[in-house]
């Protein structure tokens, strides 16, 4: 019996040791999977903890790069003050990353939120819009258009706003307003009147639209009044 028990103890012990080695081997990968799941759920605080722990134990260069992407993305979503620097550091470390266009879009968005419109334009132009998600594409187009408007490039801005007005969702109404505003500012009053009229029932833009509509109706009256006065025909 003893000769049987001893080998059994050895066998059981070897299985326990193997199980421990297997757990130690799989632990980093499990941290990555858990971090990625939390990332997909937009639990950025939780995902950061898991991915930082993963990086401390992993030697897989590809997964570390993906973890770094999720970490800087999380920093951006959390609105960290140094998010743009973290994003730029990522691009410097991984210039050939498949996420480079999205990172450029996020850097541009950080500068946009700060009112740094020239920097925003630069970084938006570094990103290929076709490589972004549909939601990001609309935000990209609107933020680039608004940045162009703020830097005096009205015609370029109008092109982007008009496109969003046609196919947009979240920024559709705002884009209609800015198309109308640009038309008004450039003297295209008939087009501006049409666009502003679409917003007369808008809770957000109704007041501004009615103001500009009134201004447009006043412009021909003022012009006629002036011409009549100049020719002596005004009574």
List where the protein language model places each region.
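Short solvent-exposed coil/turn linkers within tandem alpha-helical repeat scaffolds
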Residues: 21-25, 55-64, 91-101, 128-138, ...
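N-terminal leader/linker segments that initiate helical-solenoid repeat arrays
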Residues: 18-52, 56-69, 77, 85, ...
């Amino acid at each position: 019996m003893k000769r049987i028990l001893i080998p059994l103890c050895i066998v059981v012990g070897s299985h326990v040791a193997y199980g421990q080695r297997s757990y130690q081997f799989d632990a980093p990968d499990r941290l990555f999977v858990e971090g990625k799941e939390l990332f997909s759920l937009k639990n950025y605080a939780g995902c950061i903890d898991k991915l930082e722990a993963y990086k401390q134990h992993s030697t897989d260069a590809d997964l570390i790069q993906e973890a770094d992407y999720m970490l800087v993305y999380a920093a951006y979503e959390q609105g960290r003050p140094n998010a743009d620097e973290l994003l730029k550091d990522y691009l410097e470390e991984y210039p050939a990353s498949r996420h480079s266009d999205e990172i450029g879009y996020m850097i541009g968005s950080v500068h946009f939120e700060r009112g740094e419109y020239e920097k925003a334009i630069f970084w938006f132009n570094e990103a290929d819009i076709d490589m972004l998600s549909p939601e990001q594409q609309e935000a990209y187009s609107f933020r680039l258009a608004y940045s162009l408007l703020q830097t005096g490039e009205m015609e370029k801005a109008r092109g982007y706003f008009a496109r969003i007005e046609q196919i947009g969702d979240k920024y559709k109404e705002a884009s209609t307003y800015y198309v109308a505003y640009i038309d008004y500012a450039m003297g295209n009053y008939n087009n501006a009147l049409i666009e502003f009229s679409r917003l007369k029932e808008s809770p957000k833009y109704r007041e501004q639209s009615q103001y500009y509509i009134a201004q447009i109706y006043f412009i021909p009256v003022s012009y006629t009044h002036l011409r009549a006065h100049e020719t002596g025909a005004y009574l």
